[in-house]
């Protein structure tokens, strides 16, 4: 059985754990670098990316997460996770640099501009995925190595590169497990 960690420093940790378990994998909370040992994949949940980065630095998690990815282990970042995994963040904040694109934080607006949208994802077929966007980022300037999986208003909201999967929205807040199934079946 696949073992998936959830970075448990902020955000929708419990919701991701439920989604992982409902997809048939084992879920573990990751709070320290030694918690990464033995995992097949890692989820960086939504939250506030600046706060998450500061906590990751305080607990010395930035380099261990990069090393985890460099071993070919899969990482799935949602919302703030997308921001942290991007090569660059508009404004010059430090990132993990694991997907070759630039993240635009709060790209669709602030909290009051949060919304839901139907996404047609080729890998999923029908029906469309009902995505929940909360202070959502998006990606720009992807390299040729990045596969765009979904867009809203011509903005990249889901993508993958090698062993890294990112979404600008919160699949863990829906009852639709297709993104986690995709991660477990195609990436891990």
From Swiss-Prot:
Against InterPro entries, the record matches this protein to: Class_I_gatase-like, PdxT/SNO, PdxT/SNO_CS
Q: What is its EC number?
A: 4.3.3.6, 3.5.1.2
UniProt-annotated binding residues for L-glutamine = 47-49, 105, 134-135
Entry GO MF terms: glutaminase activity; pyridoxal 5'-phosphate synthase (glutamine hydrolysing) activity
Protein's pathway: Cofactor biosynthesis; pyridoxal 5'-phosphate biosynthesis
Gene Ontology CC entries for this record: cytosol; glutaminase complex
Provide this UniProt record's keywords sorted from A to Z.
Glutamine amidotransferase, Hydrolase, Lyase, Pyridoxal phosphate
Q: Which GO terms describe its biological process?
A: glutamine catabolic process; pyridoxal phosphate biosynthetic process; pyridoxine metabolic process
The family database entries (SUPFAM superfamilies) matched by this protein are listed as:
Class I glutamine amidotransferase-like (SSF52317)
Source organism's superkingdom? Bacteria
Looking up Gene3D superfamilies in the UniProt record yields:
3.40.50.880
Catalytic reaction(s) noted = aldehydo-D-ribose 5-phosphate + D-glyceraldehyde 3-phosphate + L-glutamine = pyridoxal 5'-phosphate + L-glutamate + phosphate + 3 H2O + H(+); L-glutamine + H2O = L-glutamate + NH4(+)
**Active site at which residues?**
79, 170, 172
Q: Which family does the record assign?
A: Belongs to the glutaminase PdxT/SNO family.
According to its UniProt entry, what is the function of this protein? Catalyzes the hydrolysis of glutamine to glutamate and ammonia as part of the biosynthesis of pyridoxal 5'-phosphate. The resulting ammonia molecule is channeled to the active site of PdxS.
Task: Quote the subunit structure annotation.
Answer: In the presence of PdxS, forms a dodecamer of heterodimers. Only shows activity in the heterodimer.
Q: What is this protein called?
A: Pyridoxal 5'-phosphate synthase subunit PdxT
């Amino acid at each position: 059985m696949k073992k998936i960690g959830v970075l448990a420093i902020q955000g929708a940790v419990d919701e991701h754990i439920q989604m992982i378990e409902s997809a048939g994998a084992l879920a573990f909370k990751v709070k320290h670098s030694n918690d990464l040992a033995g995992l097949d994949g890692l989820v960086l949940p939504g939250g506030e990316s600046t706060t998450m980065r500061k906590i990751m630095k305080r607990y010395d998690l930035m380099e261990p997460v990069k090393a985890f990815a460099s071993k070919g282990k899969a990482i799935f970042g949602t919302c703030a996770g997308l921001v942290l995994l991007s090569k660059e963040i508009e404004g010059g904040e430090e990132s993990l640099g694991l997907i070759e694109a630039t993240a635009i934080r709060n790209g669709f607006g602030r909290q009051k501009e949060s919304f839901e949208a139907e996404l047609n994802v080729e890998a999923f077929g029908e029906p469309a995925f009902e995505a929940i966007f909360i202070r959502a980022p998006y990606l720009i300037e992807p390299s040729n190595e990045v596969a765009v999986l979904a867009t809203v208003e011509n903005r990249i909201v889901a993508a993958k590169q090698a062993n890294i999967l990112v979404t600008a929205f919160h699949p863990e807040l829906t009852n639709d497990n297709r993104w986690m199934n995709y991660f477990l079946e195609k990436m891990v």
